[in-house]
UniProtKB/Swiss-Prot annotation:
PANTHER family documented for this protein: LARGE RIBOSOMAL SUBUNIT PROTEIN BL17M (PTHR14413:SF16), RIBOSOMAL PROTEIN L17 (PTHR14413)
Key word Manganese present: no
Gene3D superfamilies: Ribosomal protein L17
Biological processes annotated in GO: translation
Protein name from the UniProt record: Large ribosomal subunit protein bL17
Organismal lineage: Bacteria, Pseudomonadati, Pseudomonadota, Alphaproteobacteria, Hyphomicrobiales
CC terms in the record's Gene Ontology section: cytosolic large ribosomal subunit
Keywords, alphabetical: Ribonucleoprotein, Ribosomal protein
Similarity comment: family membership: Belongs to the bacterial ribosomal protein bL17 family.
Chain spans, region Disordered: 118-138
GO function term, MF aspect, one: structural constituent of ribosome
Length: 138
């Protein structure tokens, strides 16, 4: 019986879900806006909200909790240094989900999940191959 089980399985094992949401948290913190399916966005939202709350509380123990959840030290640093200061006066509601139509291949409902008051310049930052590597190879 599924009494009290509120989270979606998303057709994945527990380890796969945990790894997927850790990667999605890191991507959202890095780019401050990502496009994903609507069910994944709805499951990601409370995880990210709790991470931002950890960042606002600060302290070494909270930082270690965030590292164990996300496993990306650069994004944990950004969470505690940048996002914690940005949302210091806001009591929850750090993210928004915007429905973005349906995916062409399988008609899956898509959504954009982003931080409220996000930094517009963070989108696409450090994505793909570096331009330095392409110049050195030539």
């Amino acid at each position: 019986m599924r009494h009290g089980k509120v989270h979606r399985k998303l057709n994945r094992t527990a380890e796969h879900r945990k790894a997927m949401f850790a990667n999605m948290c890191a991507a959202l913190i890095k780019h401050e806006q990502i496009v994903t399916t609507l069910p994944k966005a709805k499951e990601l939202r409370p995880i990210v909200e709790k991470l931002v709350t950890l960042g606002k509380k600060g302290g070494l123990d909270k930082r270690r909790q965030a590292i164990s959840e996300m496993r990306d030290l650069d994004q944990v640093r950004k969470l505690f240094d940048v996002l914690a200061k940005r949302y210091a006066d806001r009591q929850g509601g750090y993210t928004r989900i915007i429905k973005a139509g349906f995916r062409y291949g399988d008609n899956a409902p898509m959504a954009v999940i982003e931080f409220v008051d996000r930094d517009e310049d963070a989108k696409g930052k450090d994505s793909g191959p570096s331009q330095d590597g392409a110049a050195e190879a030539a």
